[in-house]
Amino acid sequence: MKQEDTKQKILDKALELFSSRGYDAVSVGEIAQAVGIKAPSLYNHFPSKQAIFDALVESVAAQYTRDTDQISIHVQNAPQDIPVFTAITEDALYEKVRQIFEYSLHNETIRRFRRMMTIEQFRSPELSRLYTERYITRVALSHGKEE
């Protein structure tokens, strides 16, 4: 297995485990076992469990941004969406909302990431901020409310 393939498999298995059991309940050994490698080999790819978690957050956040940009919703910069939403028809708005909902519901990586963030927001101030930005503030702003 190539190093990049192994690295991605580590991230995939870590997300699977973190989203079902939480970060603290998962050991590096369990991640390595799920990948099919020995724990010391995992350290050739990531220096720590926290580094795996950080890479996972960065990777999935980037994927989410790329994917949502394809439907012209700029999740990192809501002001970019003002022209989109001021001139949108009701049917087009419905279609964008449907696409986002379908994507969030049926994309396994995004679904697991959202579940993991829901659990881990209480452990990490950075994740709490990211969770609040991505899921709370955006919903509040879409309803015309501010925190």
Language-model-detected regions and their locations in the chain:
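Hydrophobic alpha-helical connector segments
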Residues: 55, 69-108
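N-terminal intrinsically disordered/low-complexity leader segments
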Residues: 1-5, 75-77
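An amphipathic alpha-helix signature
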Residues: 11, 94, 98, 140-147
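Short, basic, alpha-helical segments at the C-terminal edge of helix-turn-helix-like DNA-binding modules
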Residues: 58-64, 71-72
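Solvent-exposed, amphipathic alpha-helical segments
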Residues: 13-20, 99, 113-116
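Short alpha-helical functional segments enriched in proximate histidine and acidic residues
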Residues: 17, 63, 67, 103, ...
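Amphipathic alpha-helical packing segments from all-alpha helical-bundle domains
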Residues: 106, 111-118, 122-147
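Helix-turn-helix
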Residues: 9, 13, 17-59
